[in-house]
Amino acid sequence: MLARASRFSRSTIAGRRLFTTASPVPTFQTSVLPNGLTVASESMPGTRTATVGVWINAGSRADNPASSGTAHFLEHLAFKGTNKRSQLNLELEIENIGSQINAYTSRENTVYYTKCLETDINQNIDILSDLLTKSKLEERAIENERHVILQESDEVDKMYDEVVFDHLHAVAFKSQDLGRTILGPRELIKTIQRDDLVNYITTNYKGDRMALIGVGCVNHEDLVKQAQKYFGDIKKSEKPFKQSGGDLPVFYGDEIRIQDDSLPTTHVALAVEGVSWSAPDFFTASVANGIIGTWDRSIGVGSNSPSPLAVTAAIGGAGNTPIANSYMAYTTSYADTGLMGVYFTADKDANLKLFIDAVMKEWARLKSGDITVEEVERSKAQLKASLVLALDDSTAIAEDIGRQLVNTGFRLSPEEVFERVEAITKKDVIDWANYRLKDKPIALSAVGNVKTLPSHQYLTKGMSL
């Protein structure tokens, strides 16, 4: 089966998979080819299938601002035929061996991966190499996919959680590379040409920015041989690559409010500058977010809920009525920065200030130290459990390994992850909250009936509490 992964399935903190869990005697190995390409494998004894894929340290951040959306455009074209395989032959070959090939583009990464039988690993690596290095990029296919991407853009505009977070990136990072959307603006999608696509490949598809990952019934030495055979000729970067391309991104405390009376639900995202993937306080941020929690009106909540914010959301209104429909404490991490905050939804006639005040109160509680050891330990336990449960097959583990290697340059072992989480104390969470939240700039993005949102000045004042 050949398919493109939806950009909307990319995960939040629970989903930006970072961790691995032990399988029966797994063996993790890495090697580096002369051109800088990393080969990593984790064998899973007893399995007859494998996930193999290529992770590239280049996504929409690497787009030329004048042709924003090129990385995502390339993903569409990869399956439309290569110099070696026509689109039809490619589809038939994949179907005939029963493999599942997928791809996605994020702000920092481009990923192509396949799940296949043990006997077909080498053939699948050949196909992956063909897609990445020998795509025809024919003019007819470019024009066909341009229409598809414009339709996809229309669909994105109807997904208000995506809209809110795209706008949040735009106000928090403004004209910097992280402020751009993955699809790119419609006016640029209409103008992207073959030269833009070729230039993106030659600029960003470099050996030292790529990793070939194999998980399952894989042999590391064989994987290295196949990597050298199919990817060994890819050139190395002329100079070391830095994801941001220069200085660290600047976070701006700004806002965007889009009044739309037609929407039955209002979507709001608050953010402060978050943690990068390799930040020393990454896990502390996750524990702090766990204390704030996640809640949805459909599941209800009792007055004895461990999350004070969930209780307020559920019964904080007049007559113990809900003041929100759902909320999520989130962390979105990148190579050199991040976003961190709370996203919530509410009915169009809700007083949004009530929930904003509740969030500010919860952040103030973390900063003041008015949290318990039990809350911290509960959050740590939930975090560890979610990490284990999230990595339940070879594809999830490959995603974990690939993401870590291309974005941080290393992979934490399961033991290291659990040791770091277990070492976090109540004091660490309090210190973290005062470092990351106290008097920090705040960004806001909202779509719907936004009339009851407090002013940005009010939000800024709340961060001083």
PLM region descriptions:
Residues L2-A14, L18, V32, S43, ...:
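Charge-rich, well-structured scaffold segments of protease-associated domains
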Residues L18-N35, S41:
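Short, Gly/Pro- and small/polar-rich lid/capping loops
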Residues V25-P26, Y252-I256:
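Short beta-strand-initiation
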Residues G46, T51-K115, T294-I323:
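M16/MPP (pitrilysin/insulinase) zinc-metallopeptidase core fold and M16-derived inactive scaffolds
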Residues T265, W277-G300:
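A conserved active-site cap/scaffold subdomain adjacent to cofactor or substrate pockets
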